[in-house]
Amino acid sequence: MHYYVLTRLELSTVPSRPSVSPPPGKDSLIVPGSSQALTIPPNIEKHFQNLEFRFHAGYWKVFTAKSVLGDKDASIFVFDKAKSNIKAPPRIGRMNKFALADLIKYETNQLSSLNHPKILYSMHGLEESKDIMAFASEIVHFSLPMLIHDEGIERLEVKLGVLQLIDGLSYLHNSAKILHGNLTPDAVYVTVSRQWKIAGFSFSVAAKEPNCYPCFPWTKKLPPSLQPDLDFLAPEYLQPNQVTVTSAADVFSLGVLICWIYSGGKRLIDAKNNLETYQIIVGQLTEALNCISEQLGPNLRDSLCKVLSADIDQRPSVQLMALIKHFDDPALSAMRQLDDIAQVFDPSQKAHFLSHTLHAALPSIPENLWFTRILPRFNEQLSDSVELYTSLSKPLFFMLEHCESHNIHKLQDWMRRILDNIQQKTLRAFVLENLSVLFRRLTDEKVEDKCMELIVHSIKSDDTSTQSSAIRGLSHIADFLPLAFITRKLFPSILSLPPYLHDNVPRQLDLLAALAALSDRCDPNSLQQLLTGVSLCSSHHPVIIHAKSRIVQRIVTRDPVRLRDSQLVCVHLLNPLVIGLANRDLRLVFEKIQINKLRKNMIFLELLIIPHPFFFSHAIFQKRMGELQWPIFRKGF
């Protein structure tokens, strides 16, 4: 049976559509490299504006656009009938010819009837003028050949894209009951958010019976452009008297496409539209797979041997392909779950995924995917989900801490968003404990101001856990805080802590650790404020005495000239050290070491009381320093 007769039968199954032939539109599209301006159909012009050429994809010229209603991003696919409408040879006794335009009508009609996340979404059906055919879809950024050849792609993203194709084919076979029939690189588009979408339904057919689809053989009598791509066609299409195929035909095409992707755009079968060459190559596919085994890896290669088998029964179903060992990867699983997070309606499941699963997988995900896939998903799906900000903060702060410096600015909006919604107790605690990441990595005055405001409010809070989080975080950010903020806002807020500190040794230790870090930033005036804060830790517990001793040591070894006020030295430093020497609860193991340190500190503080500059040349000072082998001018203590 001749191919063109079967094609007519196929087209007869397409629902009838009214002929659309409006007058030419007013606007013209200029395609780079072409001197001809394309006039878009009026109905496309009516609904879409700001068209700009993006790329060529097969016989389509693809433009970006904005919808008039809603200002949504879109892509306009334009076909130039005047130049590209290839026609079949005339039929005997008939003047009409089967042409590429007929396939396009069928393709867009099929596309409009399908609705699935992995199928290209049609926003506006086909419109036709005298010379132009056009339709609108969701925005696409690349064709698959552009992505593979020009942009480059991580292996993890390749796996993710292939799984998306598997999902799309599974929908076609099991739900829509459609065989794609021509799954080639030109049939796959990549959206701005890096989702791979299936299109190119010119040769798709509906099932006659369960898993039984009409088969139209490839023939030399028709131009290749009016037939499926021979290099991606299953061998059963070419069997003599073959009238039906199964979904295994699409599985074979998918296998060839996977080889094309993993080999960097090299065709596994390159028959150049020659049937004899095709048959020879198909008989040697095992050897062909061996040539690209390094790119495929052992697990995928072994699976593809079955996928590309000439024996239909050896090929797995498309959904089973997703279960092969090659795709058993925690990072890949996390990326897939993130892509589908909009379909999860339980907030607790989303929170667990973001704070645990995704956070744990981030070290295994290449950094460029953090910003090309993960962050865009956050922006699209989660920017308004304030209740999930605590869970989102974990992966976001991990990305901020570990990303390259040129990517830091991409996280700025999220950090501002988090600090603007800091009311949640758990979120506030997490941010307080990770303030050092913000100060160290992000140069943003607005964020820094918000952080300092958060610190003061948290210290003054009535919630003890919030106060603890704020105080514990101070020791990590002391070097980043402006001295004016420390003296005017931070120290006064610390003086409000006696109820929080009362008879609580761990809390007093946390405060002393914070004050020790802040002491390096203090001048003589602010040092008095700091030592007043030290006095708030009034416990006589040995660890408190030891912590105070370390603060004294830190101050006098860093810059003793700051200690000019003798009353300050006696009240805030000598007094607690004397108490420490008299403390009988000090463990015997540490007693000698502790007392020796306290002795040294006290002697030095006594000498500081002698008016400056006399004490530096005073004989007693020099003698006592020698006796104690004071290490102030040596490294260490």
State each model region's role.
Residues 56-104:
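ATP-binding glycine-rich loop module of kinase domains
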Residues 109-117:
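Structural motif at the C-terminus of the N-lobe alphaC helix and the adjacent alphaC-beta4 loop
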Residues 121-131:
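Short beta-strand micro-motifs within the conserved protein kinase catalytic domain, predominantly
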Residues 130-143:
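Conserved short submotifs of the Hanks-type protein kinase catalytic core
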Residues 161-162:
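Activation segment signature within eukaryotic-like protein kinase domains
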Residues 173-191:
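Catalytic-loop of the protein kinase fold
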Residues 185-231:
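Activation segment/activation loop of eukaryotic-type protein kinase catalytic domains
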Residues 236-248:
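Conserved end of the kinase activation segment
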